[in-house]
Amino acid sequence: MRTALTIAGSDSGGGAGIQADLKTFSAFGVFGKTVITSITSQNTLGVQAVDDLPVGVVESQLKSIFEDDKCQAVKTGMLGNEQIVDRVASLLKRYRVKKLVVDPVIFSTSGKKLLTLSGVEMMKKRLLPLAYLVTPNIREAEILSGIKIRRPADRKRAAREILKTGVRAVVLTGGHLKGK
């Protein structure tokens, strides 16, 4: 059976994070493994609290997965802070992960900040160069690229700028462009 690992936050409401990733994996016949980076208290009304796990706990989970079995693919989601991003990137590099998809979760749908500014910079410097694909929404693409996205041509410019980090492909996800 195919296996994939998701490295992300836990969503108590079940609509995002690890819980949503596992549902998606299962729908495609993929056995999902998890590394939890943060625990959130959230529901359909928004995010009430976020608690990042200690870096050592994240590292222990990752080592436990990779020392036992390889995964065909790895996806990252909410990573929380610079230290977690740095450690995850180091371990993914050490274990030579080839199929890495980065969902650069910076804000929740309701607007709560989920990754520190230093975490964003660490992601650009250490994690994106390891990735095959990055899937930012419009707001995340603006932050990663430094380009304001107002029209379709801006999307292409932002994607090209993100490619300069070393990631091999960029897919801007929709639903966040004003007026569309």
Which positions does each model-derived feature cover?
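Non-cysteine beta-strand/loop elements that form the S-adenosyl-L-methionine
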Residues: 33-37, 99-104, 127-139
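Small-residue (G/A/S/T)-rich helix-start motifs and N-terminal tracts that mark the onset
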Residues: 1-73, 153-180
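Glycine/small-residue-rich loop that forms an oxyanion/phosphate-binding "nest" at active or ligand-binding sites
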Residues: 66-129
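Anionic group-transfer/hydrolysis microenvironments
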Residues: 8, 77-79, 105, 139, ...
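A short acidic, helix-capping loop that chelates divalent metal ions and anchors anionic groups
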Residues: 40-48, 108-113, 141-145
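Short, glycine/charged-enriched secondary-structure capping and boundary segments
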Residues: 20-22, 48-50, 88-91, 114-117, ...
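Helix C-cap/helix->beta junction micro-motif
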Residues: 28, 95-96, 130, 166
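Conserved phosphate/ATP/ADP-binding segment of small-molecule kinases
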Residues: 117-180
